[in-house]
Amino acid sequence: MRPAVFIDRDGTINEQRGYINHISQFVLLPGVGEAISLLNKNNHTVVITSNQSGVARGYFPIQLVKEIHELMEQKLTKDNAHIDRIYFCPHHPDGVVPEYSRECSCRKPNAGLIKQAEVELDIDMETSYVIGDRLIDIEFAHNANLPGILVLTGYGKGEVHYSMPHKSITPAYVAKDLLHAAQWILKQDK
């Protein structure tokens, strides 16, 4: 069993650009490859967990999500970084694509994606973390009984300044970006 780091995609790994409806809009944030490589080298399973409701809403096809994930993995390879698994939820209860328009257990903040990973990847949940740029990621962590780290990239700064004061669930740590979050996790491991 290995610890896992469950990482949100949009706003945490790549620039937050709303719904990415073309592969050319996918841009990695600075330091992401270094952060993931650091986690890889320190024996952490790296898992991407992402809501992609644009599929259900008809903004883009599920194939585009898969192509973006392939591009992301190619870009990370340049930094000797790899992702162990990618899980995403294409559903939304108010979607327009019937196949994906429904309630589900995999849409964050529900913990379905983490529970699936726990079963499939032999994860040590006692030493695992969630990283994301939105409070929904912190709720996601809470629902899986994991510490959540909020990064200040993407929507993070706005979440800290405007949303967090009104929420009862708070992050275990607030990090500048994914690299600082990874470094903080490794300090906790000691």
Language-model features: locations:
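Substrate-recognition element of Asp-dependent hydrolases with the DxDx(T/V) motif
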Residues: 32, 36-72, 81-95, 141
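Non-catalytic pre-domain segments flanking phosphatase-related domains
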Residues: 1-7, 175, 183-190
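Acidic, Mg2+-coordinating phosphoryl-transfer loop and its flanking beta/alpha structural elements
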Residues: 129-173
